[in-house]
Amino acid sequence: MSAPLLTLNNGVELPAVGLGVFQSSAQETADAVETALCIGYRHIDTAAAYGNEREVGQGIRRSGVPREDVFLETKIWASDYGHDETLHAFDKAIAKLDTDTIDLLILPQPMPAYFSRTVAAYQALAELYEAGRVRAIGVSNFTEELLDRLAEWTDTVPAVNQVELHPYFSQ
């Protein structure tokens, strides 16, 4: 299986098809990641809030696929928004995933009522990007208005705005 690649605004290539592990149990996650990589998947999507980052790392290692061939995406949960909190959450994520870098790091939701925390979290992502610790950064479920508000506070344009879209939830 070879998924088409999408080129992000910074030139990083993102496999268009990936495995998401939301609500997967620990053992199921490790097995699913290993199997997905063995059959050709190269994009794994997880998040701290899913509670299975450690098992994603295990599945990657067990697959035998070199880490540099896997596009690894994770998300900082809203409870970890804020500059220092986000940097700490990133350190926890890479320890659990057993990797030095993340390919795509996302803020999974805006917090309009506490937007200064969202901005501080995004600024921390931008620092991680500039330091080469993540290859691309982005947001999720931001409206056009919230993207404009974010742009007022940063020069780093999100590489993605991941939105939920399926037959039961259209936007």
Explain the meaning of each model-derived region.
Residues 24-37, 82-98, 118-120, 145-149, ...:
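Short, acidic/polar
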Residues 67-80, 101-110, 162-165:
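A short, structured active-site edge motif that brings together acidic residues
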Residues 1-70, 120, 124:
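N-terminal binding-site loop/beta-alpha segment at the start of enzyme catalytic domains
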Residues 14-28, 74-84, 112-116:
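Active-site mouth loops of central-metabolism enzymes
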Residues 19, 36, 44, 56, ...:
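Conserved, mostly hydrophobic/aromatic
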Residues 41, 99-102, 134, 158:
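A structural motif
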Residues 86-107, 127-131, 153:
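CE4/NodB-like, metal-dependent polysaccharide N-deacetylase domain
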Residues 110-171:
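Beta/alpha (TIM)-barrel catalytic core signal, keyed to glycine-rich beta->alpha loops juxtaposed to Asp/Glu
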